[in-house]
Amino acid sequence: TGSVSVLWGAPPRHEDRDGDGIVNTLDVLVGAKKLCENKAAYVSNYRALGYPNGDVPRSEGVCTDTLVRALRNAGWDLQSGIHEDAIRKPRLYPLEKAPDANIDHRRIRMMLPYFRQHFVEVKKDAPYLPGDMVLLDTFPNKAGADHAGIVSDRLGPSGLPLIVNNWTDGYVEGEMDLLPTIPVLYRFRVPMTPRPAP
């Protein structure tokens, strides 16, 4: 990262949330690529987590952990962000009971209201950029997003960007050519400029 700062100058603080000299969008992508190297197995279960920055064991995860971990690499803690926001603004969240810091940040239905407030929603016809976060619909007969991933910097056989994700049982974290067949319902990007408080 030192050479990047020397060549380009350090990015403004609002474009480098964690102060590591890497702009936010690239930092999210780097976090996602690290996950591909780690190859966490798809394991869906409820666990008691530390707080803040709690995580399941690195050897396992679900699709939402892709976003949690990639964003953490750029300085965002979705666990505390979503938990504290849901406590402050419960009407914005589809809570079934009191907010739960062990699981809420790992649920797409809880990510969506948080992302709408804190990240940039990208229009469907805008070009995909590496580091974009996508919420997808893998079950067309069941309304709503049920899968999540990060847009890669590599193209698949379709010519479209691959998606870093943890697909389902029997899979490990990796890049897949999902865009030709799995509808993207929502796309978000980490902010490159400061956003006003909601």
Task: Report the location of each language-model feature.
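Low-complexity, Gly/Ser/Thr/Pro-rich intrinsically disordered linker/tail segments
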Residues: 158-198
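A structural signal for short, hydrophobic beta-strand segments that form beta-sheets
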Residues: 78-79, 151, 182-184
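Short linear sequence elements within intrinsically disordered, low-complexity coil regions
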Residues: 51, 119-120, 193
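Residue-identity detector for threonine
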Residues: 1, 25, 64-66, 138, ...
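N-terminal capping segments
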Residues: 4-114
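Low-complexity, Gly/Pro
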Residues: 1-4, 198
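...with weaker cross-activation on analogous glycine-rich loops/strands in unrelated enzymes
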Residues: 22, 87-169
